[in-house]
């Protein structure tokens, strides 16, 4: 029998140990080589997790409409601040916005409004833009901001009166469905107070319009007060540019207007090419409206016989009242008989268009606009029938006379009281913004435009303050706005209240049934504006009414 030497066993043992050590070392080396890859995977996972958490938080913010509690408001300094949630649910404390505004004026709006600037911020950066549109959007007309954005294609600062969560949903629904809105429109929210239906100063009951007081309580609640100038100021103060064009939501600008306005500012105001020697300059955009569409197709019969003059009736005395009535009856019957027997009646057609115009039919050039006005009768000058003096300083005859002129320059006009234009101006030059005592009145379920209400002193008083500050007004010859009327069968002068109020302002007569805003304008805003601009409040500047004529 042979035996292996002992040292061979030792060698085998050593070899086994060496093999085991080599395996361990190899595994360690592999682990070292795989470690960077494992770190990379961990980093990717962490980054993905962070993005997911951020996305979840943003989605939650959008879902809650980014409304936070008021944390830094001194309640003692803001006694009129209403801290109830906008949906009147006291248990939901997350519906209160983070800012507030309070009105402390003597007359007009006196309640506090909470607001949220940039509730939605436009995706497009404002760099490279010089002009912004400033507007306010009644929730019923929300889709019209998309029409403006499609044409303007530049920054828009828009404020919305929010009364409930459904209003907020409507805004974000529009943002999701309109690329132009999501790119260019900044939305600011002004939140409705739960008792904002009674925001008129109760100490001034004599300014309440008696025409609107009804014995039926339910009828009186069909209207709500709309803080139009508060909304305008919210948009104005948060616009991204100094030069702004203020318009209402139911007015569409002409195509290419932004490029034209930017070009006009450069050629008119640059030191090397300055055409206007004034530091305070405002440009007027002429305004038009669609001619009302008639639902009547039959001709109208008009008699050539003139009615009995009212002056003849004033000469009669109270004792001869019965005799006068008898005489009037005889005269009327004689007139009718004469007209019937002599065939003095004439037949004329109703001078109203039967075609409905939508935004795609609007004129793209000034030549087309002229055709729409004078040939087709589809468009007319704004407020031509209801308030002629509100637009007359624009001088539309001169405006159309420049139609054949190549690159016409803006022409200067003289301001006069009651002028109510849409303006392009530099907000950094203003001493006064829109007076927030002014309000409008809307039907609670209205789908009407913002211009169908009876209180139209929001822009009139603002333009007066600019004129008293020393602004000069220039008409833009190649820019215009067209109001898209909502009512198809509207005579444009059916606002009897408007005519009455404009006559009050214009003729300075003493009528007991004042409009609320007329009282505020005449007694407070006009003299306040004169004092701020170092003028005597008891002297007329532009034939405006004085306080003793209100």
Swiss-Prot record:
It is found in: Membrane. The keyword Magnesium does not apply. InterPro entries: Xyl/GlcA_transferase. It holds the Pfam family Glyco_transf_49. Keywords: Glycoprotein, Membrane, Signal-anchor, Transmembrane, Transmembrane helix. One of its GO terms (biological process) is protein O-linked mannosylation. It comes from the Eukaryota. Residues 58-550 are extracellular. Residues 1-29, 81-100 are annotated as: Disordered. Residues 8-25, 81-97 have a biased composition (Low complexity). Glycans are attached at residues 233, 322, 426. The chain crosses the membrane at residues 37-57. GO terms for cellular component: membrane. It is a single-pass type II membrane protein. GO terms for molecular function: glucuronosyltransferase activity; xylosyltransferase activity. Residues 1-36 are cytoplasmic. Belongs to the glycosyltransferase 8 family. Highly divergent. This is Glycosyltransferase-like protein gnt12. It comes from Dictyostelium discoideum (Social amoeba).
